[in-house]
Regions:
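Transmembrane catalytic cores of multi-pass membrane glycosyltransferases
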Residues: 28-90, 94, 141, 182-302, ...
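Membrane-interface transmembrane helices that cradle and orient dolichyl/undecaprenyl
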Residues: 154-174, 210
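Signature aromatic-anchored transmembrane alpha helix within multi-pass, membrane-resident enzymes
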Residues: 174-175, 336-360
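Membrane-interfacial loop-to-transmembrane alpha-helix junctions, especially the N-terminal start
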Residues: 12-15, 114-123, 171-174, 211-218, ...
Length: 569
């Protein structure tokens, strides 16, 4: 018995040692990660005008109310605001590392209930090699609250739901605590919580004998949390505006684009393909006995596929839950073999640990470069005059471990007003090299410009111009005009842009065969004139819509200025 206890203690020591080492490495990566644009957004009351810093808990309540109405209803963003406005990045680094340790242990528990070092080692390997953009889903303050924290809470909730003790009668206090915890976990982030809800409902539908009264109560409370997020006016507003997915496409194109996006976003993750192949093999194998895979791991993976097909999102971040449940399904399938063969288990542990360090040098190099860039840009903004116009730095080499701040206003300009509020500036923009050369030149910006054949609906933005060797459209605007930072362009014949039938089919399946697209804009003042900068306009653009904020001057006729291409031009 003494020998068995020593062996058990050694195994547990290895398990917690791997978790501890992985957490220390993760803490170092957290320290290298800087504050990002969205983190600055949460330093201010959402949708306040002018932007007002968050200073009290009442400010947080007002901010989250506004956020629910205009953006989304995720509880995860409350955590992001508390860290960004009060606790600070250093406290977040420690808290995020603790959540990461919980994440590793919870994922390991879903793979196998045995406390063996191989499972946290494999989970750490998954994070380093396969997790979608860990710099955005696990290290970035706002992103980690939305994805890693959300999934960690939901994994803990799902494990509690599967605990045999729930089959017995619970006290009213215990039920109350479970309801509150379920609602909170369900309202974190819809791409995570909708997946977990669907997966657990599917599991208990296939295993009805385990669906006790307490389980049904917890599922209902968790579903209420998910519904709170999905029912937020802000979420529906984003959907109506086409912010997250195109809406002006046919039903067939919508369906094909979702399948295409799922397949395309799963390619860098790899694991969804492997898990799907294994699942198909299991289904074929058990078809004769009519015993389909009904484990919670299989149900959660299937649910993740369905939810991603429904949402049809194009960014990598929302696929974090799908990647994690793909890993869990594959590792769980191999767990019985690993548990029964010590030599294989030890070899797998060593291999997983070694593979964890393969991407580390490149990741650390990219993170250090990004940190130096962020610090240099911050110093430049602080030392700049009220109108801060800086040259856009060279685009960094893409890295899964770095959330890019996008210091190029032609690519993204939504952080400008928050930089202004944080650093006390009237304008902050980062100009591409061709525009910056014009800005620093003593000659007028439009001295050799060519006026484009568009008629404007408003004298506040009377005309559009093109400049030689400059990839932009220049629109002189009234200094009192406040734009939203977006413009829409209508394409007269989008099919004509396709150079071949294959390209047209490809655009159709990708959901990009749309005749109306939104673009980022930015503005600056040069020699006393304010200019709005738009992307270059091609001859097939027959209408440009410049979107104006509602508090524009009362003399302006509408909240959109339209430039219409002249007939025959």
């Amino acid at each position: 018995m003494s020998c068995l206890n020593k062996i058990s203690a050694t195994r547990h020591l290895g398990y917690f040692s791997v978790v501890a080492v992985a957490s220390l490495v993760f803490l170092a990566l957290n320290v290298l990660t800087t504050i990002k644009g969205d983190d600055i957004i949460y330093m201010f009351i959402s949708d306040s005008s002018p932007l007002t810093p968050v200073r009290t808990l009442h400010d947080v309540a007002v901010s989250m109310h506004n956020h629910y109405l205009t953006t989304n209803g995720r509880l995860a963003n409350l955590l992001a605001q508390l860290f960004a406005a009060f606790a600070g990045k250093s406290v977040f680094n420690v808290a995020n590392t603790m959540v990461f340790a919980m994440f590793i242990m919870l994922v390991s528990q879903f793979v196998s209930r045995k406390l063996l070092a191989v499972y946290p080692a494999l989970t750490a390997m998954f994070v380093m090699l396969f997790a979608p953009v860990p710099g955005e889903t696990m290290l970035w303050l706002t992103g980690s609250c939305n994805y890693m924290w959300s999934l960690t809470m939901s994994l803990a909730w799902a494990l509690a739901l599967l605990h045999p003790r729930l089959a017995s009668r619970q006290s009213p206090l215990h039920i109350t605590l479970l309801i509150v915890a379920s609602v909170l976990a369900g309202s974190m982030n819809e791409s995570v919580t909708a997946t977990v809800l669907l997966g657990m409902v599917l599991f208990f539908a296939l295993n009805r004998q385990r669906a006790s009264r307490t389980v049904i109560i917890m599922l209902t409370a968790y579903a209420a949390g998910v519904a709170l997020v999905l029912a937020s006016p802000g979420a529906w507003l984003r959907f109506a505006n086409g912010s997250d997915m195109p809406k002006d496409i046919s039903l067939l194109q919508m369906l094909t684009s979702r399948v295409t996006r799922l397949l395309r976003q799963s390619q860098p993750i790899v694991l969804p393909y492997a898990a799907a192949a294994y699942g198909c093999w299991r289904i074929v194998r058990h078809r004769r006995s009519k015993q389909l895979p009904t484990s919670p791991q299989a149900c959660l993976f299937a649910a993740a596929i369905v939810v991603m097909l429904i949402f049809g999102l194009n960014a990598q971040r929302p696929y974090f839950a799908l990647a994690t449940f793909s890993f869990i399904a594959i590792a769980h399938a191999a767990a019985q073999t690993i548990n029964s063969r010590p030599a294989l288990r030890h070899a797998t542990t060593v291999a997983a640990v070694v593979l964890c360090f393969v991407p580390m040098p490149a990741a650390i190099s990219s993170m250090i470069t990004a940190r130096f860039t962020d610090e240099a840009v911050t110093r430049a903004i602080k030392s700049a005059p009220a109108q801060c116009v800086l040259p856009a730095p060279s685009a960094p080499k893409p890295s899964r471990f770095v959330m890019d701040n996008i210091y190029n206003s032609a690519h993204y300009h939504s952080y400008a007003e928050f930089y202004c509020a944080l650093y006390g500036k009237s304008n902050v923009c980062f100009l591409p090299s061709d525009i910056y050369a014009r800005y620093t030149s003593p000659t007028p910006l439009l001295h050799d410009a060519v006026q484009l054949p568009y008629d404007s609906s408003d004298t506040a933005a009377p005309a559009a111009y093109a400049l030689p060797n400059v990839q932009a459209t220049i629109v002189p605007i009234s200094p009192q005009l406040t734009t939203t930072g977006f413009a829409g362009m209508h394409i007269a014949n989008v099919e004509a842009r396709c150079t071949s039938r294959w390209q047209q089919i490809k655009m159709f399946f990708y959901g990009s065969l749309s005749d109306y697209r939104n673009y980022y804009t930015y503005h600056f003042t040069h020699q006393g004139t304010t200019y709005l900068i738009l992307p270059p306009v091609s001859p097939d653009i027959d209408r440009i819509d410049i979107f104006i904020k509602p508090h524009r001057p009362a003399s302006a006729p509408s909240d959109t200025i339209t430039l219409t291409r002249l007939t025959g031009k």
